A protein has these predicted regions:
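A late C-terminal transmembrane helix in Major Facilitator Superfamily
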Residues: 321-359
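C-terminal membrane-cytosol helix-exit motif in multi-pass small-molecule transporters
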Residues: 167-186, 379
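Helix-breaking motifs and short loop linkers at transmembrane-helix boundaries and internal kinks
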Residues: 37, 69, 90-96, 107, ...
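Paired small-residue
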Residues: 9, 80-87, 92-104, 294-302
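Extracytoplasmic gate region of multi-pass secondary transporters
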Residues: 206-247
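Cytoplasmic helix-loop-helix junction between adjacent transmembrane helices
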Residues: 94, 100-139
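Conserved MFS/SLC helix-loop-helix module at the cytosolic interface between two early adjacent transmembrane helices
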Residues: 56-95
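Extracytoplasmic
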Residues: 7-43, 58, 223-228
Length: 385
């Protein structure tokens, strides 16, 4: 096995821990809400707030780490990630839990942004598109094993134990980076990149791609953030069954990510538009599948298949485009794309909460599909540049 693949696996192990902590509250909304004496909608902010903190904080924080060698940066980030998850496990109040989650989100964003650029630069020429799929692979495998296991652990032992275990996962990621990422890796830049944020977003091709990422990724989170109450209230399945349905979802997310990684090597905008269209169609199909016994499994599988399929293309497109238009600011551009994806999570979750509160759970797929169609419209604008 080449050194590139060993490093890719070590970074993917780290993003597995990161993906688990990002999405595991989705499966524990009811339990955390009960323990903290707040509504399920408020606990949904643990997902939305995480995404917002990452979206706002990651580009700013990333702009200050350019002088740090990658191995040192990655190990410190994973150690801090572990500490913050333990802090979440012992948080005595909802407010403090939100704070620890926010700081964890910033660490997540910086790690993912810098690791994406690092791995893309290391990849062979014909594999640069799929380099980001290794990191997204860690996130998607987290949806298969990490999130369902965390949900199960939360049901059996308590949600605090789940965060403590995720902290231990972070230490495993720290160790993997420590032994695989070479010390000789030089810092990617030699100066502060804070002004690079402005430089990057002033490029229409980049800023429109970021908007496309927000809409395209956010479309699926209108429904996914509230998939547990949807399955329990609309489909009518038990709490135990939800865990296994989340496993099914995660399996198909992983399959979709692998397919998306291969597609990313083509760097085709038409492929991204096709993914967004598929997401919209799949959401509409949920109206027919999710309420029906047995058929809801097909609905969840299709939803998982398309959910992350475009992410590797979006991440690699930003890195490669920025290398062409603003080569000194690839780390910041990568962080901005991570922000765009998380604005999508936050926006999708927030819109989903509003729809759930004022219209009803059954309307979530329709709203998600409409947002996906907006992403296709923005992709048409990107073609002009």
């Amino acid at each position: 096995m080449s050194k590139y693949y060993k490093i890719a696996i070590a970074l993917a192990v780290s993003t597995f821990a990161i993906g688990t902590t990002e999405f595991v509250p989705v499966g524990m909304l009811t339990d955390i809400a009960k323990d903290m004496h707040v509504s399920t909608g408020m606990i949904g902010l643990l997902v939305t707030g995480y995404a917002i903190a990452q979206a706002v904080g990651a580009p700013i924080a990333t702009s200050f780490v350019g002088r740090i060698a990658r191995r040192r940066l990655f190990t410190w980030l994973m150690f801090l990630f572990a500490v913050l998850n333990v802090a979440s496990a012992v948080a005595p109040s909802y407010g403090l839990l939100l704070v620890t989650r926010a700081f964890t989100a910033v660490v997540h964003g910086v790690f993912f942004a810098t690791a994406s650029v690092y791995l893309t630069n290391m990849a062979p020429l014909d594999k640069k598109g799929e380099a980001a799929s290794w990191l997204f692979g860690g996130l998607t495998v987290a949806t298969v094993f990490g999130v369902p296991f965390g949900t199960y652990l939360g049901d059996v032992v308590g949600w605090r134990a789940t965060f403590a275990v995720v902290g231990a996962m972070g230490l495993i990621g720290w160790f993997g980076v420590l032994i695989q990422v070479p010390k000789s890796v030089a810092p990617s830049v030699s100066d502060n990149q804070l002004l690079g944020i402005i430089t990057v977003i002033r490029q229409p091709r980049i800023s429109l791609t970021l908007l496309m990422a927000t809409l395209g990724f956010g479309a699926t989170f209108v429904l996914y953030t509230y998939i547990r109450p949807y399955l329990q209230q609309v489909t009518g399945i038990s709490t135990t069954s939800v865990v296994w349905v989340l496993v099914l979802y995660g399996v198909f997310v992983t399959i979709g990510n692998v397919i998306g990684g291969r597609l990313a090597n083509r760097q085709s905008l038409h492929i991204l538009m096709g993914v967004f269209l598929a997401q919209a169609i799949v959401q509409i199909v949920q109206l027919m599948l999710l309420p029906k016994a047995g058929w809801y499994l097909l609905g969840v599988a299709l939803l998982g298949l398309v959910a992350f399929m475009g992410n590797a293309s979006l991440q690699s497109r930003i890195i490669i485009t920025t290398t062409e238009l603003a080569p000194a600011h690839t780390d910041v551009a990568s962080a901005l794309n991570v922000s765009a994806l998380n604005f999508g999570i936050a926006g999708g979750s927030l819109v989903g909460n509003m729809v759930m509160s004022h219209v009803g759970l059954q309307t979530l797929p329709i709203v998600g599909a409409l947002i996906g169609l907006l992403a296709i419209g923005v992709a048409q604008l990107v073609r002009r540049y």
